[in-house]
Structures are given as structure tokens and as C-alpha cells.
Amino acid sequence: MQVTFLGTSSGVPTRARNVSAVALRLPQRSELWLFDCGEGTQHQFLRSDLRLSQLRRVFITHMHGDHVFGLPGLLASLGLSGSSAGVDLYGPDPLDAYLHGVLRTSSTRIGYPLAVHPVRGAAESGRIVFEDDDLQVRATPLHHRVPAYAYRVDQKPRAGRFDVAKARDLNIPPGPVYAALKRGETVTLDDGRRIDGHALCGPPRRGASVVYCTDTVFCEAAVELARGADLLIHESTFSHAEAEMAFQRQHSTSTMAAQTAAEAGVSQLVLTHLSPRYAPGNAVTANDLLAEAQAIFPATVLAKDFLSIDVTPQTDPSCCNSS
């Protein structure tokens, strides 16, 4: 999996940072998932190497404008391209009314299947939000001024590595049968032998996991959702010195994000959703917030627009390669 940040500012865009949007690229299935869609997100797509035509799912954390104002336009542009097989959207209860209200009043026609799935019930009861053969998505309620949800994406365990040398020693002819054996299936060869694929594969390999957590003040629910994740993307709207304001506005400080990462035992933390007050040249900058977080959780990096991170299933804090 690969994460690309398309917007890392909170509230309003700046010259260097657009408002919230994070893309999750799934190259093994040529799909793209999007988490939040602030105003201008489709412009960020144009400036990146991401293909909007691959967009398949959108997960919205909450209904504040800096997380949703870009959604109607992006979906409309996708419709004009004529290349979408359909998009599923997940988010708070008002998402459906908001989206279809904008599309209706602007006489915008979406020429592809569009389905909206409220996540409140699943998030509050611990049920799965989405699942297929390869991936699972869960959500949990956060502590914010409006209903908000964090999301976790888990790759399911993959079959162990296939021992080609052992297969050759058993005189198993290469070809389609290898694919079945790699999946752990039992196959019958032309000579009548039955071969159990599990006997030719190593132990199952753990899949990667990504958690997207915004907007919220520190809460235990976020810790539980993020437990053991390879990558935690967490809002860091304020510095530690502004903790009182963070509590009032139900946002996180850099140290709250780091505390969540430390308690959850994640491999790497990325700070995002940064207040414009920390722009370069100000008394306190985003690099100061990074230093505050690293004092608690050293494996922390600072998000910037178009930063890409390859997420691999490891416990080593250096597991995630960024570019």
C-alpha cells in the first residue's frame, strides 16, 4: 500500500498546504481510496501522479467543510471523464443528504453508480465497515464538535512464500498449477499425486495496516483502533502550548498525537492537519510541532502535500519509506 498526502492544512489552505485529503493507492488491484476530500482536492490530483479514474472508495471522517467541500466537484469531474465503474462513499449520517443536495441543486448528473454508506452503526458497535478477500476497514467514533470517525485499513494475511525449489524437487511441472499451490490449494497432478499447497508455502505473511485519525482531541478509542498499526496518520492542529485551545475546539496537539502513537504501539506516526498559524516564518513552526512529538514518539514525520509513504507490514519503526 502507498499513502499520498494531497492536503495537510487545517481549516483553510495555505500557499504550501491544501486542506485535508489522503489517497491510499492499492497497486495490486489498480484501485485508489480517498480519505477526506477538502476543497481543491481534484486540483491536487492533477499535480500528482495519481489517476482519478482509479478512485473506487471515499471515506469521510466528518462533515466540516475543510474535509468535504471538494467532494461534489471531484465526483462530477470523474463523471465527465466517463471512466468510472462506480464509487462507494462512507461517512457520517449527513453525507448522503449533503452530497445529493449539492448535486441536485447544481443540476449535476453523475453517470456512474454512486452509493453512500453511513458508518455510525458499525463504528459504535465495533462491526466492520467494509471487507473483501484482501482488505478490511474498521472505524471508531472520535471526540470532536460534530460526529467524527477514524478509519483503519488492514490487509489480510497473505499466503507464505512459495518454495519453487521444493516444487521442482517434487517434479511438479511449472504453469497454472503453481498459482493454485501458492494460494494454499490442494491440486491433483496428471500422474495422480495430490499436493497440498500449504506444504510448499512458508508461514502466512501479515498484511500492512494504516490508520487515519482526524479530527479529535486525545481519546482512548483512537488508541484502540490504532493498536499495532504500521502507520498512524493523526491530526496535529496545535502545539503543546495551545493544549487548552485544543481541548476547547476538540482538536489534538502534537503531543496528543504522539501519546496516541506511543500507547497504541504503532510503527510510525505522521502528523497532519496543521494549523496555518505554524507556517514558516512564524514564532512557532510545524518543525517545532514535529520536535514536540518526536520527544515522545521518535518515529514521527511531518506530512507535507504530495508526500508519499510506502507502507509495509513490519514492526520496525523505520518500516515506512517516504518520498
From Swiss-Prot:
Zn(2+) 1 binds at H62, H64, H144, D215. Its EC number is 3.1.26.11. InterPro entries: Metallo-B-lactamas, RibonucZ/Hydroxyglut_hydro, RNase_Z/BN. Keywords: Endonuclease, Hydrolase, Metal-binding, Nuclease, tRNA processing, Zinc. Zn(2+) 2 binds at D66, H67, D215, H273. SUPFAM superfamilies: Metallo-hydrolase/oxidoreductase (SSF56281). Its cofactor is Zn(2+). One of its GO terms (molecular function) is 3'-tRNA processing endoribonuclease activity. The active site is at D66 (proton acceptor). Binds 2 Zn(2+) ions. NCBIfam families: PRK00055.1-3 (NF000801), RNase_Z (TIGR02651). Zinc phosphodiesterase, which displays some tRNA 3'-processing endonuclease activity. Probably involved in tRNA maturation, by removing a 3'-trailer from precursor tRNA. PANTHER family: ZINC PHOSPHODIESTERASE ELAC PROTEIN 1. Belongs to the RNase Z family. This is Ribonuclease Z.
